Amino acid sequence: MGWGQFIEVNVDLDMRRLSEGDRQLFNSIEEDMKQYYLNTLFSPEVDDLKMSIDFHLVLESVSRGGSQIIINAQAIFTNKRDQYFYAKGIQFPYSQGQKIIYTPSFDLDPLASFLNYYAFMFIATNLDTWEYMGGTSFFNRAIELSDLGKDSDWSVGWDDRWKKSRKIKSNQYLRSMRFNYFTALDALGAEEVDITIVKNAMSIFHEDLLTLDKKMGSNKETLHFLKAYHESIAELLSALNLKDTLELLLLYDHDNKKVYESYLKN
């Protein structure tokens, strides 16, 4: 366990596409990336998030230009619940045993900055559960970092990351749904339950989903969120007798249709 925002990090390195000789370069990178996430304090203001992530890195090729070794890769990051990021177009220079060092200033380091970007995205989404739009400053850090990446000598993949962070930040409906769902859960877990807070939060949740459906239609990030929490959401809505919201979810989230139907029958 480290002393940063992440308390559990599982790194899985896939080197099947590399030659046996090239694989020797990466003896320590798995552990180095894990320790980087565990021991980096990405922001001293939010040091109690206790996040866990899985990080699957596929090394696609190793090329040599002059004295540099250049790595091309793709990756999947997930918090094993509602956050899932697929990263393609990862490119960075690397030398055997290279240490990954965090610098708070906005100097682009192709490998560290790539890791920082996803740290910022996980932190932003987590903060959105604690405070309304609480993750905005971290979404902005991810966007600013992507801007730097796009304008750097290592621009591959950064335009996609720039678009992704802007898209998620601008989806105020999902961000509000997430906040209000967790607000309702917190209120239910209090020593003295104020049912008005719970009902108000889930009423806003309904309005947000309704507006999101009208303005955006099927949204990948929203469906990931519902995939993770649909059972708990349905149980809560049923207890509150909010059948309209269950019916809305039934139409929006087809993959979990049977769950919503079962709670509507109760």
Describe the role of every protein-language-model region.
Residues 20-28, 109-113, 220:
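Soluble non-cytosolic domains of exported or imported proteins
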Residues 67-167:
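Acidic/His-rich structured neighborhood in mature extracellular/periplasmic domains
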